[in-house]
Amino acid sequence: MTIMAPEAVGESLDPRDPLLRLSNFFDDGSVELLHERDRSGVLAAAGTVNGVRTIAFCTDGTVMGGAMGVEGCTHIVNAYDTAIEDQSPIVGIWHSGGARLAEGVRALHAVGQVFEAMIRASGYIPQISVVVGFAAGGAAYGPALTDVVVMAPESRVFVTGPDVVRSVTGEDVDMASLGGPETHHKKSGVCHIVADDELDAYDRGRRLVGLFCQQGHFDRSKAEAGDTDIHALLPESSRRAYDVRPIVTAILDADTPFDEFQANWAPSMVVGLGRLSGRTVGVLANNPLRLGGCLNSESAEKAARFVRLCDAFGIPLVVVVDVPGYLPGVDQEWGGVVRRGAKLLHAFGECTVPRVTLVTRKTYGGAYIAMNSRSLNATKVFAWPDAEVAVMGAKAAVGILHKKKLAAAPEHEREALHDQLAAEHERIAGGVDSALDIGVVDEKIDPAHTRSKLTEALAQAPARRGRHKNIPL
């Protein structure tokens, strides 16, 4: 059953109406309901998103606050069955207070069946959540089980609301602070993208459908046309912090945006989707503006999940590396940096899609291994001419290796001796040439040809796709 465009449905329509929300998401005139409208609290439909057949469901905020009962959950499960059979992406538009209390355990069982359908679809079809109202209680886990979560400004995601938190723990918190988009974008990492408003949330969801389902092909001529001296974006001092995002956008196509995920959570790692020479790619980049670009427990976990997402959907990876190591500290050790850091090693180690590493300035220690190194079977490892590949920086290394020699030197000669030893150490063990000799770097490249080199390496590699679920690490 095809429905009318939103403007033809009637101006008096409640803005929470699921028919209106689905119409705002799908291409005009393409919406076909998958069942008759009812009081179940859910409306599911098929339609197109820029021509891509897509399945979507919307919890109905006008009926019991979108609470999920047996019938509504059945509609969602049926929508998933259709999407899996069609191999179509599925989008959930969420405005729900959780399970229907009046239906008791039956509702809980039905919500669990929705979760099972999501897990069954994981890694097989793209799942995108657009949260436009509450996603509370059991409904909070629906978006969390999907691949990408987009939150509108008025959305709220939490398992227990402020009143329960206050009565149990004594903590006084409002809904926005507890489960608003800024909270989940900065503190919890639940939210991948914060939209400007509800309509922008639908636009972001539509853009994601295109990136996942209209991946395109590498166009070498487009790569050459976009080549510029990206090296100029690095600061002159090798010790100065900088934001890596301009380098990322310079590598990617200028005519399409870079959709960064979880920008404010674990910000020392930048991840997101964009296009390189016409094709969808995933980008991971250390960001020296935050924590000097160090890996820590959260950024390693963030990167690991993103690698597995891209691998599950056959999206090649570009890994931009400028990393001094893992962030030291008691908080990191107690916060699980070993366990969570191992996730990134595992993610790259099992990754099957083409993945190319570019070392721009430095890569040291264990973080060198974790950032898609040759030892983890990177497709190619490129480095700019001044890059360092080492266990640690040369100055720090000689401070350990030649501690006694430096201590014995006259004080007025110590600094010059330290510089001399550091230069010698870098020549032997830390420069790009040494890494080339060993074979852990494939090629030293001119920064002005970065786009062409990355495109060529990814285009020549066999297209592959991992066969695994996308667990929300």
From Swiss-Prot:
GO CC, alphabetical: acetyl-CoA carboxylase complex; peptidoglycan-based cell wall
* Stretches assigned to the CoA carboxyltransferase C-terminal domain: 225-473
Alphabetical list of InterPro entries matching this protein: AccD/PCCB (IPR051047), AcCoA_carboxyl_beta (IPR034733), ClpP/crotonase-like_dom_sf (IPR029045), COA_CT_C (IPR011763), COA_CT_N (IPR011762)
What is known about regulation of its activity?
A: Activity of the AccA3/AccD6 complex is inhibited by interaction with the epsilon subunit AccE5. Inhibited by dimethyl itaconate, C75, the herbicide haloxyfop, cerulenin, and 1,2-cyclohexanedione.
Keyword Transferase annotated: yes
So, what pathway does this thing act in? Answer: Lipid metabolism; fatty acid biosynthesis; Lipid metabolism; mycolic acid biosynthesis
Q: What is its EC number?
A: 2.1.3.15, 2.1.3.-
Q: Biological process GO terms, please?
A: fatty acid elongation, saturated fatty acid
Binding-site positions, (R)-haloxyfop:
A99, G138, H185, W334
Q: Which cysteines are joined by disulfide bonds?
A: none
Domain CoA carboxyltransferase N-terminal, chain residue ranges per copy: 2-224
GO-annotated molecular function: acetyl-CoA carboxylase activity; propionyl-CoA carboxylase activity; transferase activity
| Keyword presence, Lipid metabolism | yes
Free-text function comment from the UniProt entry: Component of a biotin-dependent acyl-CoA carboxylase complex. This subunit transfers the CO2 from carboxybiotin to the CoA ester substrate. When associated with the alpha3 subunit AccA3, is involved in the carboxylation of acetyl-CoA and propionyl-CoA, with a preference for acetyl-CoA.
Q: Which family does it belong to?
A: Belongs to the AccD/PCCB family.
| Protein name from the UniProt record | Biotin-dependent acetyl-/propionyl-coenzyme A carboxylase beta6 subunit
From what organism does this protein derive? Mycobacterium tuberculosis (strain ATCC 25618 / H37Rv)
